């Protein structure tokens, strides 16, 4: 599976975090 940055950003934003694609993984990181 490949990381969809848009979807990653949206799901992380609901947690108050910033979404980043690291390789094929979505990571939620603090701003």
From Swiss-Prot:
Keywords linked to the UniProt accession: Amidation, Calcium-activated potassium channel impairing toxin, Disulfide bond, Ion channel impairing toxin, Neurotoxin, Potassium channel impairing toxin, Secreted, Toxin
Modified residues (Tyrosine amide): 31
Keyword Secreted: yes
SUPFAM superfamilies in the record: Scorpion toxin-like (SSF57095)
Stretches for region [R/K]XCQ motif: 6-9
Disulfide bonds listed in the record: 3-21, 8-26, 12-28
Pfam families named among the record's database cross-references: Toxin_2
InterPro entries (UniProt xref): Scorpion_toxin-like_sf (IPR036574), Scorpion_toxinS_K_inh (IPR001947)
GO CC, alphabetical: extracellular region
GO MF annotation terms: ion channel inhibitor activity; potassium channel regulator activity; toxin activity
Lineage top rank: taxon: Eukaryota
Tissue: Expressed by the venom gland.
Annotated family: Belongs to the short scorpion toxin superfamily. Potassium channel inhibitor family. Alpha-KTx 05 subfamily.
Known function: Blocks small conductance calcium-activated potassium channels. Shows activity on KCa2.2/KCNN2 (IC(50)=0.0243 nM), KCa2.3/KCNN3 (IC(50)=1.7 nM), and KCa2.1/KCNN1 (IC(50)=42 nM). Induces cell death when tested on human T lymphoblastic leukemia Jurkat E6.1 and human breast cancer MDA-MB-231 cell lines which constituvely express KCa2.2/KCNN2, but not on human peripheral blood lymphocytes (which do not express KCa2.2/KCNN2).
Record's miscellaneous remark: Negative results: does not show inhibition on KCa3.1/KCNN4 at concentrations up to 50 nM.
Free-text comment on this protein's domains from its UniProt entry: Has the structural arrangement of an alpha-helix connected to a beta-sheet by disulfide bonds (CSalpha/beta).
Protein name as catalogued: Potassium channel toxin alpha-KTx 5.4
Organism: Hottentotta tamulus
């Amino acid at each position: 599976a490949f990381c969809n940055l848009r979807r990653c950003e949206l799901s992380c934003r609901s947690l108050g975090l910033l979404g980043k694609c690291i390789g094929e993984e979505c990571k939620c990181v603090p701003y």
